[in-house]
Amino acid sequence: MGCISSKQFKRAAEHEDPAILAKETTFSVSEVEALYELFKKISHSIFKDGLIHKEEFQLALFRNSNKKNLFADRIFDLFDLKRNGVIDFGEFVRSLNIFHPETPLAEKIAFAFRLYDLRGTGYIEREELYEMVLAILNESDLLLSDDAVEQIVDQTFKQADLNSDGKIDPDEWKAFASKNPALLKNMTLPYLKDITMAFPSFVLNSGVDDEEL
């Protein structure tokens, strides 16, 4: 993979300078440049406009641009920092930074909280947790009965909802996640230290490869 100069970034689509992105994240300049190659691949898979649309994001994650999944939607929404329906290169790098092994645990916990807080109320409610558990199980090809899913939700609230008000606030979530590190197992991608051309999927062991694009 060849190096990409700042001039090439500007010519491409006024993308942010990799040196600036490296200063703001745990990535090195060379890692940011490698991520740019990956970003180009994904952002030109369908619309070819230098921005990642939801369909392209889903194709990269699930190899299916038409698949509807709450989990994929939530990840896309959290990556779309400007909330304009697309992901630009700066958003791509800053969002992937959450999954870097050297990113502080507190930031990973906060991201996971926002992931489950579907309606953006500042709390995780039972219905939100139930919906997310179903979505994650669906993508993991795990089939559980409704009763089993309810038990997962019940146990989570029993342990996390310390003041028993029927919702989990950020402090309760932080305490719960700290005691249950398995919750964040998908929040660290070791191979982000050694960037490759495979999309670092935190849902499935899949990627976007040359043959498919």
From Swiss-Prot:
Keywords: Calcium, Cell membrane, Lipoprotein, Membrane, Metal-binding, Myristate, Repeat. Signal peptide: none annotated. The record marks 140 as: Involved in dimerization. GO terms for cellular component: plasma membrane. Expressed in roots and shoots. It is a lipid-anchor. Residues 31-66, 67-102, 104-139, 148-183 form the EF-hand domain. Its main location: membrane. Acts as a calcium sensor. CBL proteins interact with CIPK serine-threonine protein kinases. Binding of a CBL protein to the regulatory NAF domain of a CIPK protein lead to the activation of the kinase in a calcium-dependent manner. This is Calcineurin B-like protein 7. It comes from Oryza sativa subsp. japonica.
